[in-house]
């Protein structure tokens, strides 16, 4: 059964947006499967996928967003981490995981299965135990929810990632608000997640001036003297700020085709940073 583990984990992670929770869900599915009478199970793989998806949907349905400092953001994953068991090509971008939070769990699952794994409506209906018409309706609602977002069809642009990261880090270190503004689109949004343990200065800022001012304030008051690494999480570039081997803050960036920053996802929640190891591409 372990041969299915990575695929099951990828399904679960895309639905729940938390690597730790996804691991627990898959482990629970596998442990329960061991005790089942398998005489009527014809396709082990399909059975485990179906069980995992429905378990993840039920978990997401029960899960109430905890009171957090700032905005709730997904747990990022690095594919270069030896402990990460996700299938890279099938794992959603960080931006997409953020967008999927606007959908209910079944809409989220239907969207992921159709758009991420190219399932037919017949296959989705079987997995979710609904009709094909219900599957179409779920996907239609999901698309309507996401279509107003300019990032619904977002795909990462890696060509200019390191150049932008370098300029971004230098501007922060020098408290250069003008240069920061030059790196941001006009309607830039910054979202910060401190979880239940770390209070953030601001959960959300929109616009060049407000965002650049906040970034410099945080740099000068909380990140001075920290070392940094440039890394990738969920297919997107990021800068991580460290004190020795302890990670304090991670900025995941969304870049447009011109290398400008459209979104900044700032994570300071220690529970979401604990699986990140110190890697550097520079």
What are these regions (language model features)?
Residues 105, 117-134:
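Helix-turn-helix DNA-binding module
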Residues 8, 12, 22-33, 48-51, ...:
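Short, small-hydrophobic-rich alpha-helical interface motif
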Residues 126, 132-212, 216:
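Solvent-exposed, charged amphipathic helical/linker segments at domain boundaries
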Residues 1-10, 20-23, 39-40:
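A short, charge-rich alpha-helical start-of-domain segment used by transcription regulators
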């Amino acid at each position: 059964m372990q041969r299915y583990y990575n695929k099951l984990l990828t399904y679960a992670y895309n639905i729940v947006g938390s690597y730790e929770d996804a691991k627990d869900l898959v482990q629970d599915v596998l442990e329960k499967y061991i005790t089942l009478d398998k005489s009527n199970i014809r396709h082990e793989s399909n059975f485990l996928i179906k069980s995992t998806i429905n378990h993840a949907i039920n978990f997401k349905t029960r899960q109430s967003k905890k009171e957090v400092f700032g905005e709730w953001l997904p747990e990022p994953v690095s594919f270069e981490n030896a402990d990460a068991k996700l299938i890279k090509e099938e794992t959603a971008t960080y931006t997409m995981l953020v967008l999927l939070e606007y959908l209910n769990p079944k809409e989220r699952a239907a969207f992921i299965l159709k758009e991420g794994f190219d399932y037919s409506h017949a296959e989705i209906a079987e997995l979710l135990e609904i009709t094909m018409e219900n599957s179409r309706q779920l996907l239609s609602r999901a698309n309507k929810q996401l279509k107003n977002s300019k990032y619904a069809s977002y795909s990462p642009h890696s060509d200019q990632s390191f150049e932008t990261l370098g300029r971004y880090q230098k501007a922060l270190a020098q408290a250069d608000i003008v240069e920061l503004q030059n790196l941001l689109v006009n309607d830039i949004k910054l979202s910060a997640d401190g979880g239940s343990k770390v209070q953030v200065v601001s959960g959300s800022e929109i616009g060049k001036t407000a965002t650049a001012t906040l970034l410099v304030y945080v740099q000068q008051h909380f990140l001075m003297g920290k070392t940094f690494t440039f890394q990738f999480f969920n297919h997107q570039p990021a800068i991580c700020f460290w004190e020795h081997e302890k990670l304090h803050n991670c900025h995941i960036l969304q870049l447009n085709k011109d290398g400008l920053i459209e979104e900044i996802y700032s994570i300071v929640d220690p529970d979401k940073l604990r699986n990140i190891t110190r890697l550097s591409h520079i």
